[in-house]
Amino acid sequence: AYAADALLEVSRSRPRLFPIIADARHPARYAGTVEADLSWLIQDVASAEQAQIATANRRFLADDGMSMIFIKPRSIDATASPSTVFADVEAELTDTYEITARVSMDTTHEDHRAIIAKVR
């Protein structure tokens, strides 16, 4: 609940930030509240289906849109090494996104990575 509260608080002063507090695995459920042709989509979920969620939510991005996807390997596969999980997630994203940057989050979140990607 803290993360959702913090996101809502930040969005109050940013009129172009639209927080979605919903099950990201089901974009059809919140499609009516999301603008089309977004320039950016930021995904920060803890789910084994992070790559599939990013692919499903691509529908909201403009053709030149960008996505920032926070990858949490232990949420995807607690038995695999983080590097293996990162590689697997990136492979799943390649049909939908071109990865332009990888940013380690180790200074604040061990074994987390942010992937910056543009729509293919």
Q: PLM features: what roles do these ranges have?
A:
Residues 3-13, 55-119:
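C-terminal substrate-binding/active-site "lid" region of AdoMet-derived donor-dependent transferases
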